[in-house]
């Protein structure tokens, strides 16, 4: 069934390209060969790191409005073909205008989006979600994005709990600057989750560009809504470009658990890179883990 959906999406994209310039077909394939030790011995594996395929675009309406849309799936070219090979990612229908934009469907929460590009090992083994809660892509959600005012913008995500026993959730974030540090040298954000996937979470994020270095930091406190157990942690990251290469490192803590990562990316072209990284985790109540990987990524 999932394969049929993807084939239909490709067919629709091919047909629609002739009629609407607003449609964009895009994707990313990221694969690593890695040596992994998850506490019970070392082994070798091939992994797809959130490779994806999607369609997105907008269509102009009357009165300064436009309809926006995105349909995105995660694919796994390293795994055997089965029903788990395709997974839904952000998929929504929206309406945009001078008021901002409203999106309805499955979408990254405001707190998740607020971290910008600070997590330098996003989608890899050292993704911040290993130690932290809050990296939620929520279904049954309504998201509102404000226009930018003097560099400030905000996002609010309302999560509908479709059962009498559940509590609706709210995720909100206030951002300043450019999260890619392309149009400004500063990015900062403050975000809050209430009753989102069983946690109340506060996250503060910041990143600056100084003398070529990208320096990032995050602080988070999270509390389980079922057990009231509260935990705190922080993250620091640094990246430095050297010609076609970029060196990067990151350290993350959540209470007594911590992780360290170091890596290098090397551009082979505008949309293609090779890379290598090492990540190590020290857990207080679980087996320690470490990974060494080399990989290739291409975007289209």
Name every feature range the model reports, one short phrase each.
Residues 1-300:
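Outer-membrane beta-barrel proteins
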């Amino acid at each position: 069934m999932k394969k049929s959906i993807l084939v239909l999406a490709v067919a629709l994209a091919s047909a629609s390209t002739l009629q609407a310039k607003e449609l964009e077909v895009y994707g990313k394939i990221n694969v690593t060969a890695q040596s992994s030790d998850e506490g019970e011995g070392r082994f070798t594996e091939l992994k797809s790191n959130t490779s994806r395929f999607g369609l997105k675009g907008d269509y102009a309406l009357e009165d300064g409005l436009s309809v926006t849309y995105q349909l995105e799936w995660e694919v796994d070219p390293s795994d055997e073909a089965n029903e788990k090979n395709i997974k839904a990612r952000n998929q929504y229908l929206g309406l945009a205008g001078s008021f901002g934009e409203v999106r309805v469907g499955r979408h990254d929460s405001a707190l998740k989006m607020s971290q910008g590009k600070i997590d330098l090992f996003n989608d890899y083994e050292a993704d911040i979600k290993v130690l932290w809660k809050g990296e939620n892509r929520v279904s049954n959600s309504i998201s509102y994005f404000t226009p930018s005012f003097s560099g400030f913008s905000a996002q609010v995500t309302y999560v509908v709990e479709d059962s009498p026993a559940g509590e609706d959730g709210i995720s909100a974030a206030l951002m300043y600057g450019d999260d890619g540090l392309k149009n400004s040298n500063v990015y900062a954000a403050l975000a809050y989750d209430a009753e989102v996937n069983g946690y109340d979470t506060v996250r503060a994020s910041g990143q600056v560009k100084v003398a070529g270095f990208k320096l990032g930091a995050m602080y988070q406190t999270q509390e389980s809504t079922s057990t009231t157990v509260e935990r705190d942690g922080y993250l620091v990251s640094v990246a430095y470009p050297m010609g076609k290469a970029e060196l990067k490192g990151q350290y993350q803590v959540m209470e007594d658990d911590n992780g360290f990562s170091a890596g290098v990316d090397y551009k082979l072209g505008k949309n293609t890179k090779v890379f290598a990284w090492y990540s190590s985790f020290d857990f207080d109540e679980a087996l320690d883990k470490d990974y060494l990987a080399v990989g290739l990524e291409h975007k289209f």
